[in-house]
Amino acid sequence: MAKSALVWLASVCLVFNILSLPFLALGLSSCGGSCQTLNDYEGQLICINGECNDDPEVGTHICGGNSSTPSPPPPSTCQPSGTLACKGGKPKNTYTCSPPITSSTPAVLTNNNFEKGGDGGGPSACDNKYHDNSERIVALSTGWYNGGSRCGKMIRITAQNGRSVLAKVVDECDSMHGCDKEHAGQPPCDNNIVDGSNAVWNALGLDINIGEVDVTWSMA
């Protein structure tokens, strides 16, 4: 009798363990649940910083925005192509590319004189003309200028004070060349520059004497 009872008890335990397995797996793969290794999840979730979350490489959205752990941003693929140093100056990186353009692209706004004899050097690359600084116009870093494909197009620039302005692309802020007469002796531009006229700075309510400020921009 005792032996039969033990057999019955063992059978019950076995059935309970089998029935518990799906719930255990579900618990391990729950969004936001704790985990320690990549094996602590099932399906298309991944262990990120000790939490089960969507796998950014797979592109799943099972967890949605419930997890406190954001997906990591894609790595930047824009790397320097070389260096160039003006006489007596330090070497600067040169670029053929710029960061990806988004609906709110981070950039550095600088000030440029588009008039003849100004610090912009030669005439604007888009139309081979000089422009009055009262125009709301900009030059874009080489990668964003993209061989002139954005010439004449409008972009929206937004400052950190909340003000924004529409400006027309008329020139390239050369990230590859510099230190010569064509570039007014200036070194190459960084790869994240929006070089704006006085009118752009004034419309944004910014002090031109600051020289450069962080902004965002997008195609209008």
Swiss-Prot record:
Disulfide bonds: none annotated. This is Ripening-related protein grip22. Belongs to the kiwellin family. Expressed in ripening fruits. The gene is grip22. Transmembrane segments: none annotated. One of its GO terms (cellular component) is extracellular region. It comes from Vitis vinifera (Grape). It is found in: Secreted. Keywords: Secreted, Signal. Residues 1-27 form the signal peptide.
